[in-house]
Regions:
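A conserved catalytic-loop motif detector
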Residues: 32-39
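Active-site beta-strand/loop architecture of penicillin-binding DD-peptidases
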Residues: 1-31, 47-137
């Protein structure tokens, strides 16, 4: 989604350096289009709503930057009893959302007490991504985004507004 719909096989090693300091980049990784660029752009806008004040991870927002993300909360299976016991909380996000440069994933296994991905992973993401953006000299975004409707009530209201605008255009 952050790469305009092209999935690139992940790697941990960007390249190697020999004893003389000569750098050799890793082999080119396979890339495959998995969604259209248009769909990826729409998904990025939706994912920005996740870090909005009404989203599930407002604690991941970084002042001055457009940030997008996805929260996750999953129950963990306990092999000893074959039942669910504990949680995995996660948040994965990227910034700047309008021109993605960095992606960070935070996964917390078996947290105690609070277990929601946005509440636990969001602050960690914010701290790490803020450091990355500042240390890499990424200028603040300077643009804003209209939030995507997050509830059925908001979706219905937006649909009615769009229909009213369309009706006005037809009568003009």
């Amino acid at each position: 989604i952050a790469n305009d719909g092209v999935r690139v096989s992940p790697t941990v090693i960007a390249g190697t350096s020999d004893a003389s300091g000569n750098y050799t980049p890793s082999a080119t990784r396979e890339s495959v289009r998995v969604v259209s660029a248009e769909t990826a752009q729409k998904m990025r806008l939706m994912m920005e709503s996740v870090v909005s004040a009404n989203g599930t991870a407002p604690t991941a927002a970084i002042a001055g930057y457009r940030v997008a993300g996805k929260t996750g909360t999953a129950m963990r299976i306990d092999d000893t009893c074959g039942c669910y016991r504990g949680y995995t909380a996660s948040f994965i996000g990227f910034a700047p959302a309008d021109k993605p440069a960095y992606v960070i994933s935070v996964t917390i296994q078996d947290p105690k007490g609070l277990h929601w991905g946005g509440a636990l992973g969001g602050p960690v993401f914010k701290k790490v991504m803020s450091f990355v953006l500042q240390s890499k000299g990424i200028a603040p975004t300077g643009t804003t985004v209209d939030p995507v409707a997050l509830t059925e009530k908001q979706l219905i209201a937006e649909r009615k507004l769009a229909e009213q605008k369309a009706a006005r255009v037809k009568t003009n």
